[in-house]
Amino acid sequence: IDYYPLNMSQISSLKNLKSLCKDMENGKIDKLFILGANPVYDSPSDLGFAESLKKVKNAVHLTNIIDETSKLCSWNIAMNHYFECWGDAMTYDGHVSIVQPQIMPLFDSRSVIQVLSPIVYSLEQSAYDTVKNVWKSTIIKSGNFEREWEKALHDGLYKRPILKKVNVKPISKVSTAILNDYSLDNDMFEIVFTPSSSVYDGRYANNGWLQEIPKPVTSLTWDNAALISMKVAKKLNIKNGQMLEINVGNNSIKIPAFITPGQNQKSITLELGYGRKFSGRIGNEVGFNVYPLRDSNNPSFVLNGSINVLNETYPLASTQDHHGLEDDKYAAPGFDDLANNCLLYT
């Protein structure tokens, strides 16, 4: 295994977002550029991004769709599609590549580089010129620049890595003390958040083809659900599609249950990316928004969530139920034995 150093200061974090929200709330931010993101919808609820954004006098949103964040911004700028953009990228081992557009922009739109260039360099220039100038000053510092630049354009990759391998000594002993902070109270659950396999974090919610794709394990389409174990379902008498109220601290959501073999009995899995209000004609009001339960301290999971079983049901579409025989009077007697042998019970 090879290890390469990465400059982590260049990677944004929730800590930065939390600091930004605090500054917006205190009126310290007069102008804000939001580049291709939708934090009003997908930022952790404890940050209160939407309310803080309302206190910014001039908020500019570079976006390819009018979404939840666009509605609270003063200005919206049409963003280029990825296939219309110049840029660059770096692999984990330090090789760099030039991102070249496949087509000219179809509309009067802008890329992230075009928006930032006048701000960073006090000079309005094309995205191509910006990328080329950056490479000249940081990547190809010696030799015949034009020749090396043209070769990188042709090959698609600059074959001299800019990162050097480092020697890493493995930790001889790992402390388990950190696990003491992650304990569950009785009758409480760990709530795990996972990106959707079809709409990811919600950015693809308006794509009907992706909404139609059955999800792994559950085969659900056009919806998300709270994945619970069979033991919990039996204990609380929960059926597929029965509405649950899930509470974490002062926040709560309503979402249908889906019984999932193999799910840990103390864990509930919630899929992100649904419940959009401004994603487009196809994606609006599809599924349930679970972002209100996320916390900036642990955005991947939260502890000590509770559930209330509601006397409501919601129809869920799962392709795995097609051609089911469990209700057939001839097949039903042997179904329980077959299920016990084939499924993973926890």
Regions found by a protein language model. Name each.
Residues 3-106, 136-344:
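A cross-kingdom feature strongest in bacterial/archaeal respiratory oxidoreductases
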Residues 111-136:
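Non-catalytic, well-ordered alpha-helical segments in soluble enzyme domains
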